[in-house]
Amino acid sequence: MKRRAVTAGMLSLGFAAAGCTIPARQPSVPRAGYERAKPLGLANARYFVDGDATALIAEARLAAERGRSADPQSSGDGTISFLAISGGRYNGAFAAGLLEGWSRVGTRPAFKVVTGVSTGALIAPFAFLGSDYDALLRDLYTTMTADRIFRRRPLTAALYDDGMADTTPLAELIGHYADWSLLERIAGEYAKGRLLLIGTTDLDAQRLVIWNIGAIAASGHPDSLDLFRKILRASSAIPGAFQPVLLDVELDGQKYQEMHVDGGAMAQLFVYPPSLGPLAANSLRRFRAYIIRNGRLGPAHGETERRTISIAQRAILTMVAAGGSNDVVRAYFVAKRDGVDFNLAFIGEDFEPSVRLGEFNPAYMQALYAYGLDKALANDVWHKSPPGLVGSGVAR
């Protein structure tokens, strides 16, 4: 009887699979011309961490010129502040609480550059535009539920689809908040010399792509808002779990598509590409970097079931955690090399929620938001180096 049931189940799966087709896409960009492909025809829409830094250096210098033009009275010797917000899914509640507490204390800088990856990419535009959006972030990261992010697909999606979940709900959420008004405000800040940079991973090219959101916003292109929304969705697209985002580009008159996913597949955070270091090192101005790591930086002990899926999940989480820690350490040493003042915030061992950790559990996120808020209000949040390194105490 059992054998008959198993056979029937396998036949049903086979018939279901027979009606499935792999999602289609346009050809990827040829390797030889990859860096010449331009989304929306914009030359400064994006940059590559591992590519020729000439264009990015030119963009940084133009931003400095715009800043001087916007504020002619500036002496040019003030401190330039960077903010980098990492990935971390629902742990983005930590950043949301920290930012609001920082605003209340009154010491939150007007950042010259804000960067974001994954959940940090969703937070970054609002952090970039200032404390007016603190309440919005509080609402998002204390009431969010999984059904507002994704819809689960059947198991056959593992073989015949592009992700185990459909992120149409996330696209709708992004569409609600990322509107023309928001884009116009970003363009206005770009005109003042400020930069908003979002990281995605191009799976075809296996490269981290840094999107210059201000330039896209200021382009006036009718499809700029659509591209902005797709970038935000792509930066949060966990490979395999969430569907990727296909971005249209053009090269030599031919149309191609690039497959973009979570920037965390390459780096869970970035402050600035290392190639820009000489600009900071040779400048008379002071540079200060603030990094918000939406996660812990120590091991998360837990018993692993002796099951294939459990072992694989635990191994992936371990690799992700290790990658995040390495990104923080890398940012620290790059900052030290360039003489940039380093400040790091992360979820510490003193965060012990009484509620269960789960996929977008509002009670857990509310507790984490309150933790970040209280840490900022107490001025007990910034560390001068990653844990375990000399001088890793709290900066006050």
Q: Predicted regions: what is each one?
A:
Residues 3-7:
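N-terminal export leaders
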Residues 89, 117-118:
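Catalytic nucleophile serine of serine hydrolases
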Residues 8, 21-112, 128-396:
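Patatin-like phospholipase
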Residues 16-19:
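C-terminal motif of bacterial Sec signal peptides marking the signal peptidase cleavage site
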Residues 8, 118-120:
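Alpha-helical hinge/cap motifs
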